[in-house]
Amino acid sequence: MSRLSPLDKYRNIGIMAHIDAGKTTTTERILYYTGVSHKIGEVHEGTATMDWMEQEQERGITITSAATTCEWNDHRINIIDTPGHVDFTIEVERSLRVLDGAVAVFCSVGGVEPQSETVWRQADKYRVPRIAFINKMDRIGADFFRGVQMIKDRLKANPVPLQLPVGKEDYFKGIVDLVRMKAIIWDEESLGAKFHEEEIPADLLDEAKEWRDKLIEEISSHDDALMEKYLGGEELTEAEIMAAIRSCTINIQIIPVVCGSSFKNKGVQNLLDAVVDYMPSPLDIPAIKGIDESGAEVERKADDTEPFSALGFKIMTDPFVGQLTFIRVYSGVLQSGSYVYNATKGKRERIGRLLKMHANKREEIKEVYAGDIAAAVGLKYTTTGDTLCNEDQAVILESIEFPEPVISIAIEPKTKSDQEKLGLSLQKLASEDPSFRVKTDEETGQTIISGMGELHLEIIVDRMMREFKVEANVGKPQVAYRETITKKVKVEGKFVRQSGGRGQYGHVWLEVEPQPEPGKGYEFVDAIKGGVVPREYIPAVDKGIQEATDNGVLAGFPVVDVKVTLIDGSYHEVDSSEMAFKIAGSMGFKEGCQKAGPILLEPIMSVEVVVPEEYMGEVIGDLNSRRGRIMGMDSRAGAQVVSSMVPLANMFGYSTDLRSATQGRATYAMTFDHYEPVPKSVSDEIIAKVKG
């Protein structure tokens, strides 16, 4: 079976935007006009085809990026709908990694909103060509030109309008096409399916000519042949203009801007035309690079004759077919039922079935080709970011980077019977979402889950209940404290028991001191001379001390960074045993800790906040109030970057506070840096709380 549409007719695009810019509605309309759905799904009625997880319909936000295929002007368009909430940046990041281009949706009233800045930076990172769609032109306060200006100012991009709106707010009825110099007007009755072309209204003609000149000037500045023609006063043909816009868009020299109102069904067909005309096909973007088994860099071109290579970019659990692995095929062909090699894990996998996804319907296909996006059933080992390829021509494609989780909570099942289900459901969710981790706390035996933010964990707990029917209680976010000492002391540990028959006798002298530099951990030195403590008992002393480090003397937290030297002791021919020396070591160490100035340590996080200039003051003030230290400032892409060190204990609720303090325009990244002593007043409070 040969491929249905040639590679140059493929468009793999994402739709990215701020939370309420109308992303899902735009995707819905695209599916409606390309003939995939027969009834328009409205987000605020909770029936959108793309938002198919129950929570998404309730909350009206898109959480998981659904992949959908549709056809327009005999081109095949694969669309990935991405979430706009800051806790889900991982979803956006992984979709951008496998796309060739993106449509950025902006609200004509709000313009460039906070999340758009974050998503835009992510798209810059992967060099994804973009088209801007200024949506909601029918809203009160809609302003197309302000939107264009904000793309320039806030995102430091080069927006070039290809259309102008005809009328605005309630009177928005069509657009002026600056390439063809025609007006396109929609009629209200046919849900936007019917529109007609007419001459540009007289009151818009001068403005249209002015913007068309700007467009031609911009594209010819990147093309010498056009520049000559333009400067020589010759008219450029429509085909020349379109070819130049296409090449400038693919090289990210310009961002073409179109407009419309998805909700009112206007402008969506022209957006689709722009995707087909100006977005790259898999052939237009640089061949993907990877590393072969010898460690050398190799390229895989988008071609069916090249060896097969693909990247798994999303795992989903589907109630009917089980686990789906979404893959983007970069080169070669893959048949269902065949074997592939997971180069990242070094495992062979069998592809059960291959599905083409239409939002939440699925169509079974026999094979996928270079440039395709499809879902595979039956992969056991593949997780997000893994490379699939031919075993004899193995390659590892550059993977997706995942941020470290920043918040943890303890979770326990409400009933005994849920215990096993809890473990299984958490494992499944963790395999779908690499930014979510599960571990068991050795000290308390609790299950601890960690993620990218409070909303992220809320949704995970919610999904456990809905999809796996597991009811769970969730604790408060927790901090992992440690204990250490500050002085060097010499102590005696003596354990003597005499009660008829054989007694117990263990006796040691220890020097207990802090390590010269933090992070060195526990160290045991044997300095016994002349056999005052026999050889065979020394490991027991060490073991006793090590066990005692599990529970500190202040509040029972693990003791770190101590050096213990065994300097002296005595033994009894009959009564001494390993057990006695183990207890003596542990007693001596505990007493040593009491005398050696014990202190609490807390995890200090390195926090980087990217914030627009005007909110700098609030952000710095807030970090200081959280016992933070500002380490430096720096400007990046029109925003300020504040680096600081802040105790983890003071960072709970931060994403919510930061969002409200900066109207959501700031983003932050937090990573663990080091442990540091807790100030006395704070540590007294913690100890009192623990001892209750």
Swiss-Prot record:
GTP binds at residues 17-24, 81-85, 135-138. One of its GO terms (biological process) is ribosome disassembly. InterPro entries: EFG_II (IPR041095), EFG_III (IPR009022), EFG_III/V (IPR035647), EFG_IV (IPR047872), EFG_V (IPR035649), EFG_V-like (IPR000640), EFTu-like_2 (IPR004161), G_TR_CS (IPR031157). This is Elongation factor G. Residues 8-283 form the tr-type G domain. HAMAP family: EF_G_EF_2_B. It comes from the Bacteria. Keywords: Cytoplasm, Elongation factor, GTP-binding, Nucleotide-binding, Protein biosynthesis. It is found in: Cytoplasm. One of its GO terms (molecular function) is GTPase activity. Catalyzes the GTP-dependent ribosomal translocation step during translation elongation. During this step, the ribosome changes from the pre-translocational (PRE) to the post-translocational (POST) state as the newly formed A-site-bound peptidyl-tRNA and P-site-bound deacylated tRNA move to the P and E sites, respectively. Catalyzes the coordinated movement of the two tRNA molecules, the mRNA and conformational changes in the ribosome. Belongs to the TRAFAC class translation factor GTPase superfamily. Classic translation factor GTPase family. EF-G/EF-2 subfamily. One of its GO terms (cellular component) is cytoplasm.
